[in-house]
């Protein structure tokens, strides 16, 4: 693995760091993937509370970083299934019924690149190859900037992120994110702890209701209290063939005015989702216990998301005979039960008729809209 970050596919590696961090009284933000390797090594200023546990944490982090930090690597892999698997979780490694991939990666001091080609069989697409998980990235100061596409997972759930997950193919575009987070001596900002952010501007496919719209996304997460993570997330589907692609319309979308007034050329210029997620973890008799939830809504008319849906979960992480174990219980509900109750609301849109999807599959939860899902899983 030659990436400047660790992807959601290797989430279980991060669980041991999460276990050691909570036991030592500090936090690691495990609610957003990919996670920069620099953030693994320096997750929180309070990591020095217990020298013994800190040494254990650093040893595990260094082992992960050493594994991920090879300068050059080639990878080949394949998967084969009798049928297309509609289930996909945070650590799922393949997306298609049958697939074969090859990738070539480079990781330098300030520069990283990856070219990956996948040949696949999928019921949702006519084209049988793509270049998902290919990018060029540059580290500048405390930022990672780049161009390309890769999977993102925004939210604390292990089975379905409501706003951005690995279920659809990754779309191409530009991105910028924090390398190891930001802190400030200013009292107001310092109160929120370490801040991590991620932003991208992608373009979606032509084979949809509105051809080639743009997808903008941003996430800010913070740790105001050790063990407690707050994430704020927003995505905007904007423009495309036949829509208003002007800078004014873009500003109206970003500022929130697009949902409260009509533009000059287009009365419904974007499709937005926004919301927040919370995760709190604590140590109880050498078991790290977490509670978490995500709350997302469709376009709002008063600068607040409405037509909302949610997920809830809890996780137990512990060591048994020196091996890490994880028990997860989650519930996800993408029905909307408020005003204008009915079906075809979540992930749907009157103008962007292909909905909140890319190449036919949801950008958010794999269960799509009008669904609920409960799951119990054990890893170890």
Where in the sequence are the language-model features?
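Soluble non-cytosolic domains of exported or imported proteins
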Residues: 7-11, 30-35, 95, 211
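Short, solvent-exposed alpha-helical surface patches in non-cytosolic proteins
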Residues: 2-3, 15-23, 30-65
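Signature for the C-terminal beta-barrel architecture of outer-membrane proteins
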Residues: 153, 173-356, 367-378
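Short linear interaction motifs
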Residues: 19-25, 85, 358-360
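Well-ordered mid-protein domain cores that form the structural environment of catalytic cofactors
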Residues: 94-191
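Residue-level signal for inorganic ion chemistry
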Residues: 40, 141, 293
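Transmembrane beta-strand segments of Gram-negative outer membrane beta-barrel proteins
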Residues: 7-19, 55-117, 145, 194-199
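Transmembrane beta-strand segments that form the barrel wall of outer-membrane beta-barrel proteins
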Residues: 72-91, 112-123, 145-153, 157-162, ...
């Amino acid at each position: 693995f030659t990436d400047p970050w660790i992807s959601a596919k290797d989430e279980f590696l991060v669980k041991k760091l999460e276990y050691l961090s909570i036991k030592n009284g500090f936090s690691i933000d495990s609610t957003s993937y990919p996670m920069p390797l620099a953030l693994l090594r320096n997750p929180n200023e309070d990591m020095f509370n217990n020298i013994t546990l800190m040494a254990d944490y650093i040893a595990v982090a260094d082992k992960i970083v050493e594994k991920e930090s090879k300068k050059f690597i080639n990878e080949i892999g394949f998967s084969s299934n009798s049928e297309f698997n509609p289930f996909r979780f945070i650590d799922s490694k393949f997306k298609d019924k049958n697939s074969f991939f090859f990738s070539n990666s480079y990781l330098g001091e300030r520069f990283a690149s990856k070219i990956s080609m996948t040949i696949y069989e999928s019921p949702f697409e006519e084209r049988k190859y793509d270049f998902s998980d290919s990018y060029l990235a540059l580290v500048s100061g405390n930022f990672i900037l780049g161009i390309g596409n890769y999977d993102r997972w925004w939210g604390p759930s292990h089975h379905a992120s409501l706003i951005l997950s690995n279920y659809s193919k990754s779309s191409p575009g530009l991105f910028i994110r924090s390398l190891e987070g930001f802190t400030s001596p200013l009292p107001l900002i310092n109160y929120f702890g370490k801040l991590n952010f991620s932003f991208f501007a992608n373009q979606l496919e032509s084979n949809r209701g509105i051809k080639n719209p743009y997808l903008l996304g941003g996430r800010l997460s913070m740790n105001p209290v050790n063990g407690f993570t707050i994430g704020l997330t927003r995505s905007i589907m904007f423009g495309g063939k036949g829509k208003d692609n002007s800078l004014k319309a873009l500003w109206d979308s970003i500022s929130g005015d697009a949902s409260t007034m009509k533009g000059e050329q287009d009365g419904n210029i974007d499709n937005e989702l926004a919301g927040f997620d919370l995760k709190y973890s604590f140590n109880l008799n050498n078991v790290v216990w977490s509670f978490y939830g995500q709350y997302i809504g469709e376009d709002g008319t008063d600068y607040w998301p409405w037509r909302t849906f949610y997920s809830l979960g809890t996780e137990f992480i512990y060591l048994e005979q020196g091996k890490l174990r994880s028990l997860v219980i989650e519930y996800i509900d993408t029905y909307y039960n408020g005003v204008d109750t009915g079906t075809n609301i979540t992930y749907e849109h009157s103008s962007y008729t292909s909905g909140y999807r890319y190449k036919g599959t949801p950008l958010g939860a794999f269960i799509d809209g009008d669904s609920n899902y409960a799951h119990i899983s054990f890893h170890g």
